[in-house]
Amino acid sequence: MKAVLVALNAKYIHSNLGVYCLYAYSRKKGISSDELVYREFTINQEMDDILGALYKEKPDLIGFSCYIWNIEEIKEMACELHKILPDTAIWFGGPEVSYDAGKVLEQNPYLSGVFVGEGEVSFYEVLRYYQKKEANQVLLPKKEEWAKKEQTEQTNDQKKSNAQKNDSIKTLEQIEGIAYRKQSGKEDTEAQKFIKSSDNASEKTEIIITKARPCMSLDDVVFPYHDMKDLKNRIVYYETSRGCPYGCSYCLSSVEKNVRFRSMELVKKELQFFLDQKVPQVKFVDRTFNCNEKHTMEIWQYIKEHDNGI
């Protein structure tokens, strides 16, 4: 089982905090570096080059991080990927698709699913679902022989590890915070009342939108930069809070009212990491950075007192 997270950045110096956080959370939960990787590209690269690089990965699952500046390129890329990797599950996530996941699935038939809202836990559980699917050989026909071969080659330690991982894996309809295309012949239970039928009657497809996932504590978000190299040549994105208390009609951030803050103890420790690594530019991506004066001033004070002149 192999999954690839894909970031399509505006420029090389930019980075993708969303992809980093999903990767770091799943790795901390026990997913190995052989099972999950992330790849970063830019919208200025030739699409054929990106497609070639992703094709070489031969992933079972591929997830794209979707924003306003890359959504059209990602749709085109994902459509082409489906042609050359028809057995690969393709999932979208990010602010450009999260707010209307059912419609995104209806309009893009090559998609397997869309993550709705925060993705750390949902992505991990979806990844575990696909691991179980492979272990049980509940696969698309073209992969059955390959799966049998892989299973027979596993060592006893690998089998034991997989058994432990599969103990509490959920089915898709039990995973909160996702939308997915219903497989024919499969009966849904908890998610049944969230079904949306496709407008295209000839396709006879149904979209399942599961229950919203409760917001996680920001202290449970894994700091993604500890093991990363070459931070001196990139713009680093960092968040100390999520959510927005305001209701601006033009902004997607107004959808999530639950403002949460990362504990100041963690924030200071992570700011010190950036200072020690001599990162030249850190951009705070909090929706409303100054909505809590005490929180904001503590951050400024720490930076002022520990300035390293970079």
Where is each model-derived feature located?
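Short catalytic helix/loop segments, enriched in acidic residues and glycine
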Residues: 19-27
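Radical SAM [4Fe-4S] cluster-binding motif and immediate context
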Residues: 202, 219-310
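Nucleotide-activated donor-dependent transferases that construct or modify glycoconjugates
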Residues: 2-11
